[in-house]
Amino acid sequence: MKQQHTLTYFISSLVILVFCVSVNAQNDSIPKTVKDTLIIKEKYGLRIGADLGKLARSFFDDEYSGFEIAADYRLKKRIYIAGEIGFDEKTTVTDYLDITSTGSYIKGGIDYNMYQNWLDMDNMVYTGFRIGASTFSQNLNSFTIYNTNQYWARQFTSNDLQEFKGLTAIWVELIIGMKVELFNNLFLGLNVQLKLMASETEPDNFGNVFIPGFNKTFDSSGIGVGYGYTLSYRIPLYKKNK
């Protein structure tokens, strides 16, 4: 009787041991959860484009022609070196003045991307600054001297062309905008600029009405505004882990 009890205990223990080994083997055969090893890489490169707004305005506005080339280079994850170079010709006509402003400009600065992209998205919502410089000329086509007492004398009007060359201007501007990747490496952008004049040379007897790159001046306040619609293509140079 005692031997039968001992045999039963031995068999039971053996069954339990085999069961435990079997369970352990099954657990070992189940693959463990693998940590996500997907590595997303971000593109770094040179982005070059044109201002579509200036091209469209040149087509529709008879008193304006101009173009602008814009570029940026991704320096760090959120920091871009950026700049623009362009040309403007604008004729301003008022009741007392007809003047054509012509010249070129260059701007350079930094953009900071505030937008956190998902996965491999590559869009921008950014803010930045520029330092701009322009060299230009003003052609005074005609002008009228306003006379408050027209009873005794008529207003004086001159149609003699006067040219003022070698004028310069330097300014700073704040910029905010966005760039959306339409297709692989092709971007559509929109931005607005607030400009503050640092220094300028003016023609004799009147102020600058329009400065290339700075745009219209407002009552000699030294404040200007601008906007841009850009289409650009990025030349990818290398990638970094996100």
Which ranges hold each PLM region?
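Bacterial N-terminal signal peptides that target proteins for export
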Residues: 2-11
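Bacterial N-terminal signal peptides
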Residues: 11-20
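Short glycine/proline- and aromatic-enriched beta-strand/turn motifs that initiate or cap beta-hairpins
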Residues: 25-74, 232-242
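Short loop/turn motifs that connect adjacent beta-strands in outer-membrane beta-barrel proteins
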Residues: 34-44, 78, 116-124, 182-188, ...
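Extracellular loop and loop/strand-boundary signature of outer-membrane beta-barrel proteins
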Residues: 35, 54-57, 92-98, 158-164, ...
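Residues that define the transmembrane beta-barrel architecture of outer-membrane proteins
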Residues: 44, 63-67, 102-106, 123, ...
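Gram-negative (and chloroplast) outer-membrane scaffold detector with strong preference
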Residues: 79, 84-153, 231-235
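Outer-membrane beta-barrel transmembrane domain signature
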Residues: 130-226, 230-242
